[in-house]
């Protein structure tokens, strides 16, 4: 079991504390099943966080076809490429707690103004509508949307993954995340500590 080594430094209060953002991976679902899940959870807008909004293996989730299907269910669609994955890791990365190069690259990208502006755009929609962030991967812990979830959590926003038509799962912040205000980083020191087998003990630093 990982020790919870999440550090939170100076989290600022925000009007977004009562806001909830849903997440979902389209995976290999039929479009009808996908729509039923969205409707069951009252989703009003899908925010597509794929870098490239198309799928050769699941063409029903290519941007144009998906947007048409959503319109029929009166659900809005927005692609925000600035939240997309596939970001290269920096040689001087401060996020070496991630052994996975893809996640480390996205964590590096999270330090940029482009990411912050794109996330703010997402939050502006979430203030008005129930949004669901959508990517391709079935489970969030294999997808960069889990890191987006960390960034939203740092801003006081509740994040829940759609699991079924009747159930969601609360997002768990990455155990080795270091949160300072709204900045999230993943230092190696915290990762090494969190991976050490021990009882789960939460630590918060103010």
PLM features per residue range, with description:
Residues 3-206:
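Residues lining hydrophobic/aromatic ligand-binding pockets adjacent to catalytic sites
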């Amino acid at each position: 079991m990982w020790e919870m080594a999440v550090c939170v430094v100076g989290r600022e209060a925000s009007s977004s504390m009562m806001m909830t953002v849903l997440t979902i991976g389209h995976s290999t679902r039929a479009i009808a099943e996908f729509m039923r899940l969205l409707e069951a959870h009252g989703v009003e807008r899908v925010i597509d966080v794929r870098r490239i909004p198309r799928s050769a293996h699941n063409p029903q989730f290519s941007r144009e076809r998906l947007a048409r299907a959503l319109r029929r269910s009166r659900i809005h669609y927005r692609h925000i490429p600035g939240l997309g994955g596939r970001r290269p890791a920096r040689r001087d990365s401060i996020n070496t707690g991630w052994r996975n190069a893809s996640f480390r690259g996205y964590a590096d990208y999270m330090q940029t103004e482009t990411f912050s502006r794109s996330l703010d755009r997402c939050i502006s929609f979430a203030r008005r509508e129930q949004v669901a962030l959508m990517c391709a991967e079935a489970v969030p812990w294999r997808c960069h949307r889990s890191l987006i979830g960390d960034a939203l959590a740092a801003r006081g926003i509740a994040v829940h993954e759609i699991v079924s038509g009747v159930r969601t799962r609360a997002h768990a912040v990455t155990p080795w995340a270091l949160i300072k205000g709204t900045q999230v980083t993943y230092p190696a020191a915290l990762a090494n500590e969190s991976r050490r087998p021990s009882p789960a003990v939460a630590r918060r630093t103010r």
